[in-house]
């Protein structure tokens, strides 16, 4: 019995002599460490790793090599631009016999962050943010982008104005024959009738993608999330009591916004980031469809905006 195991990727020649842009694996389970100034945690991620296969005579790549490199990287290093780019180079170096010159890595994970209640001291809860990291080395050029998804509440300005008009009409009908009003009477009427009409609001989602500088010490995930939530001012909450719910209602009333307003707010907050792209979606409670808006500093790249807008990625 022969001790040598067959390797058809080496011994079998391909019948179609054509290069392949990317070959590799998707959805590899992996623990990753995120280490940022205000956040340190090990998380469960799913990874995609690929290299190019430019040599048409080579039947296939060595997927086990990519897997082992990824596995060792996940155990040894925190996720950072430096560690990601080092892994990409190792992936390319491991496939010199395939002529590989390019590599890419994608990580998908949820960043779990503890958030305090708006008002109640000592009350907090966990909030999850979906994160996508894409690192590439193509033609010698390194590129790293991060994408985060952030939930927030949006209240329609038009609906708020229509609601205020109905409340105003109700007030005038009630007090039209009373030229002098006591504050207590007005307050009592408002307690019973201020919700005569209410504006529609809904849970909404922002997707934000930015390029991370290659010399950055970390990905800056929490800093980006905090920046966007600060611009929107109505991020969805975790643990709440009545005082927190009231404070949240006040924030929504003070920050009425169309989907266009939300996209512009976020884009304005990203001026310090390179190549930022924004997609916001309001899951309308008035309609069975969503309202959406997209924003990017350079509107001259519609192909990139379209790929970002499809939302078909895992």
Swiss-Prot record:
Coiled coil: none
Enzymatic reactions: GTP + H2O = 7,8-dihydroneopterin 3'-triphosphate + formate + H(+)
Domain of life: Bacteria
Compositionally biased tracts (Low complexity): 291-305
Keywords from the named record: Hydrolase
Pathway per the UniProt entry: Cofactor biosynthesis; 7,8-dihydroneopterin triphosphate biosynthesis; 7,8-dihydroneopterin triphosphate from GTP: step 1/1
Ranges where the record places region Disordered: 290-314
Record-marked site positions (May be catalytically important): 156
Family, similarity comment: Belongs to the GTP cyclohydrolase IV family.
HAMAP family: GTP_cyclohydrol_B (MF_01527_B)
Name of this protein: GTP cyclohydrolase FolE2
Naturally occurring in which organism (per UniProt): Pseudomonas putida (strain ATCC 700007 / DSM 6899 / JCM 31910 / BCRC 17059 / LMG 24140 / F1)
